[in-house]
Amino acid sequence: MKVHFFTGFPGFISSQLIRSLFRNKQTQQVIAIVLTGETIKAHHEKNKIVNEFPNCSIRIVEGDITLPNLGVDNQVIEEIIPQIEVLWHLAAIYDLAVPRDIAWKVNVHGTTMVNEFVRSLPNLKRYMYFSTAYVAGTREGLLRESELIRPFGFKNYYEETKYEAELRVEDLKSEIPLTIIRPGIVRGHSETGETIKFDGPYFFLNLVERLKCLPIIPYIGQSTSTINVVPVDYILNASTFLASEQEAEGKTLHLTDPNPHPVQEVYRTMVKLVTNAYPKGRLPFAWAKLSLQIPFIRRKLGVEQETLDYLTWNATFDTTEAQKILQKGGITCPDFIQTMPKMIDFYLAHKEDTSYQIQIK
């Protein structure tokens, strides 16, 4: 059976992907590269997974994706290179507020090092690279899966460095069997609400939760945009299916919601579910943007200022290719509004646990 190699472990998506692969019997053996500072956490997560799947194994290998041979001991490298048939590259800095130098080192240089490692694998059947739908930067309108066009600008360094990284993976398509995954904004499980950190759409839950003591909670600006949020179970089901689906080889696929909801509808539903009242009035977008430039206010509200840029971004992700392939497996994206109650229940149950909250600077 194929050996799968992971970067990004013990992150939430990597850990859940491994569970999905074991559950689907797509592999019984995983090798995961882990930073030295993450080994205790990684072994803890490994033990949890192996207890769930006692016939499967996870080998933890210490390393660093920003180094040649991923910083792995030479003897270990020689041992594992012939074994790897599927490589999943998920390691990245996902913070919208990340400084450019840190994002470049991990997202761009790290991916370059992973690409070099991929080239050395004689038995590779598939390279599964996790990009983001937001490599589009400030481009608007219909964004196609087949396009990788440099935009006039980016909303943050996360977007810029993921774009640069995807360029480097795209260059491998002529020589390596690979699939590029472009997820939308990922939230917790659609059926349980489970996640391990409150970022992305959870910033707005932080805002609503911390303003609910006010007589009213206003809308933020006047937006006609949609927001593309997908549950982690859709990402897991789709990605594990695509990893063994021949038609996905050589493709770039949007794992985004083909039927996204308007920003105003999403915000209205969040406010109603948290406060049992609908938002009233309207805070001008410029005022909100200006307020979040003040660190104290950002921290008090639990919102990164870069988040606001997505409220007025008018773009639609084309999902034609992804849906065509995924329909073979009967895989569809759960509706955000219909499954939002589970997301909010989980948030409310864990909102006081600081391990879930992102440190706002």
Spans of model-derived segments:
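Mid/C-terminal beta-alpha module of Rossmann-like enzyme folds, strongest
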Residues: 241-304, 324, 347, 351, ...
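Amphipathic terminal alpha-helices
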Residues: 12, 318-361
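Active-site Tyr-X1-5-Lys
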Residues: 153-184
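N-terminal Rossmann NAD(P)H-binding glycine-rich loop of SDR-like oxidoreductase domains
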Residues: 2-27
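Glycine/proline-rich active-site loop of Rossmann-fold NAD(P)-dependent oxidoreductases
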Residues: 27, 189-202, 242-253
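Conserved Rossmann-fold NAD(P)-dependent oxidoreductase catalytic core, especially the SDR/UDP-sugar
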Residues: 89, 97-105, 109-157, 179
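NAD(P)H-binding glycine-rich loop region in Rossmannoid oxidoreductase-like domains
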Residues: 58-109, 119
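A conserved pocket-lining segment of Rossmann-fold NAD(P)-dependent short-chain dehydrogenase/reductase
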Residues: 192, 203-230, 234, 238-242
